[in-house]
Amino acid sequence: MSSRSSRTIYVGNLPGDIREREVEDLFSKYGPVVQIDLKIPPRPPGYAFVEFEDARDADDAIYGRDGYDFDGHHLRVELAHGGRRSSHDARGSYSGRGRGGRGGGDGGGRERGPSRRSEYRVVVSGLPSSASWQDLKDHMRKGGEVCFSQVFRDGRGTTGIVDYTSYEDMKYALDDTEFRNAFSHEYVRVREYDSRRDSRSPSRGRSYSKSRSRGRSPSRSRSRSRSRSKSRSPKAKSLRRSPAKSTSRSPRSRSRSKSRSLSPRGWVTVERHWIALI
């Protein structure tokens, strides 16, 4: 189990009249809250320590609430006990590379949410390119309790994977819906995850394309060899030309083909023979 310090966050710049219930409402969406220690000094702002069951939920809360505008107060959220972790660090712990994904958005970039998984999984297609795993998680919570979210991008667009904690929540979420974040909104499609359809890895797809290219190469080489043999054949040339041209050109082509196997003297003899005929 993770240490308490990694599961507890500090929340600063709270309004002086905030209540503990309001603090819980702010952070319970990121995971089960164990304890809230709210401090309201004589002179505001106030602050609080919020402990989660899981350190990954604490990271979620830092990412989602650091800088959040609550009733005109921009909250400051970081790890407690001197273990400062900014919202930028929290993003890195999940996406690894920010919104751009791997290599600045090369089509295979991925952004991950918490690593807890379940068998009650749905696929969300048609997401806007600006969607993050946190945006997806927040949106899909309308269907039930989400324990995992992931966003990845490929040549077909932006797709999400969401795991629910129960079968009922997963079934409730299976419906087309309108996805919104700070940048855009799209109508997305939600369907149940199919292991046979959705578990193909990118590396498997790449190896398949290579094998197909290897399969084509022999046919290309055979077609080239056939074209060369036809172009060198005197008979092939004579079939494509008129009779008048074939009588004047075919002897010369035959003499050249024979000249490769005969000595220079023999070639002259053959050449004179044809000249005499002409």
Curated annotation (Swiss-Prot):
Residues 81-121, 192-263 are annotated as: Disordered. GO terms for cellular component: nuclear speck; spliceosomal complex. CDD domains: RRM1_SF2_plant_like, RRM2_SF2_plant_like. GO terms for biological process: mRNA processing; RNA splicing. Keywords: mRNA processing, mRNA splicing, Nucleus, Phosphoprotein, Repeat, RNA-binding, Spliceosome. PROSITE patterns: RRM. Residues 7-82, 120-195 form the RRM domain. Residues 207-243 have a biased composition (Basic residues). It comes from the Eukaryota. Its main location: nucleus. The keyword rRNA-binding does not apply. It is found in: Nucleus speckle; Nucleus, Nucleoplasm. Component of the spliceosome. The splicing pattern of the pre-mRNA is regulated in a tissue-specific manner and by development, and changes in response to various types of abiotic stresses. Probably involved in intron recognition and spliceosome assembly. This is Serine/arginine-rich splicing factor SR34B. It comes from Arabidopsis thaliana. The gene is SR34B.
